[in-house]
Every structure is written in C-alpha cells, then in structure tokens.
Amino acid sequence: MPIRTSLRLAALGLLAIFALAAARASHDPVIRIPASVRDSLNSVWSLANTHWNEISDQNTLTQALGTGKPTQKEYLGCLIGDASADTFRVIGWIPANDMKRFQFAVTGNCDSVPGAIGTFHTHPYRAAPTGDRPLKEPGLSQQDLTTFTGGTDRVLVVVWDVDSLDVALRAADGHVVHPAHLLPR
C-alpha cells in the first residue's frame, strides 16, 4: 500500500475517533445553577465550617472514632429544578427531610419534595492524619458516587469550599457522568 494511502487511512481513522468523541461529549448532560443559588450553597458551606480552625489539635483517627470535637457537620439539601433532555436547571433548594448531620456523613431524603431533581451536600474540613492542620475534601467521594449510581436521582452536587462544586449527573439513558459540566449563568 502506498504511503499516501496509508496516511489518508490513518487520518480518516483519527477523524472518525474525534467525531465519535465529539458526538458523545455533545450528548453528555450539563447543569445550570444560577448565581443566587450558588451564593446560597456557599452560605450553607460557610456556616457548616464556621469553626474550622478548632480542629487543628485533632487527628483523623480521633475524628473517625467520634471522640474528637465535631465542629463541622455535613449538610444535605434537595435541589429543585427541571430537566430538558440532558440539560438540568436548578432554580432553588430546600433542606432534606429527616436530615441527620454527622462529621463525615449526612442522611435525609427528598422523596416527597415537589420538583426535586437531586441533592447537594457539603464536605466540611477534616483533620489531617497528623492533626497539624485542617484538610479540604475536594470533590465527590467514591462513596458519594457509589450511592448516587445506585439511586434514582439525576443530579448530585457537593460543595467543598466557597465556589467549589463537583457535579455528577445521570443522563436520560441512565449513564452517570462525573465530573459533569457546570454551565456558568
């Protein structure tokens, strides 16, 4: 086979791969969260971390055993909005029903909340293993994603710092996309 033909076939193959990837990316779900809602999520996170500097004398084991100071606790809220195909729009949120807040977990439900499309929760600072400083828990944890994948919600958001969100979305065909694209508003 002449070199020119081989190069053309290789180029066509690459073009096909890029086209498939672009088609898939264009169909992945996206979410829009207006600034007013993001500001209120930031406020919840800030309030949940008011005493972050009080864990500098704690270590991870102390916190995990529950014998440390539970200065911060996770928070769970129900995201209210709508979806058009795989584009989600959040218009507000309310606290989850039956919420139980713990240092490294939160429980509650949004089952009876009209217009709920998913949940958000906060990740508070935690103690470093050595206890010399607080650490951030950036992003959704593997446990968060496992729970989301096994459920029916279409949206999962974690707030892990002011203006720091991580998002997982369930597409209309059921596949979970993480990290999902958060569109500015």
Model-derived features: positions:
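Conserved beta-strand-loop surface patch within small alpha/beta domains used
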Residues: 21-116, 125-185
